[in-house]
Amino acid sequence: MIQKAVSNSSTSFGSITMTDNALTSDVPVNSTVVGQSQGFYAGAAQRELGFLMAMNFAFKTGKYNGSTITILGRNTVFSKVREMTVVGGSGIFRLARGYVEARTKWFDPKTGDATVEYNCYVLHY
């Protein structure tokens, strides 16, 4: 049985946001851009701020140029550390598996903009 959604916009339940952001080598805004972080997050929790997140790290420079890492999982954005699964990849990261740890480094509550650090632990062939 599917339960009716709780009418509570504070959790963003039911919302879907697409992303296409710079993927950088380090946290500071002026860090070297190495690709794009593209995907979506959808409000999936009715009683807390929790998202279903699907994201590709698409590399556009260096030895990883043309390769991707694909991430899928639950993202409770106000938790200090969030762990999500690496479900695959392409190019150098073909058949990738592993996990990422996400940590919010900066957040603007007025705009919803954030800088998030992702540490990737990936096994691939």
Curated annotation (Swiss-Prot):
It comes from the Eukaryota. Glycans are attached at residues 8, 30, 65. Dirigent proteins impart stereoselectivity on the phenoxy radical-coupling reaction, yielding optically active lignans from two molecules of coniferyl alcohol in the biosynthesis of lignans, flavonolignans, and alkaloids and thus plays a central role in plant secondary metabolism. This is Dirigent protein 22. InterPro entries: Allene_oxi_cyc_Dirigent, Dirigent. Keywords: Apoplast, Glycoprotein, Secreted. Pfam families: Dirigent. Its main location: secreted. Belongs to the plant dirigent protein family. It comes from Arabidopsis thaliana (Mouse-ear cress). Disulfide bonds: none annotated. It is found in: Secreted, Extracellular space, Apoplast. Homodimer. The gene is DIR22. One of its GO terms (cellular component) is apoplast. GO terms for biological process: phenylpropanoid biosynthetic process. Transmembrane segments: none annotated.
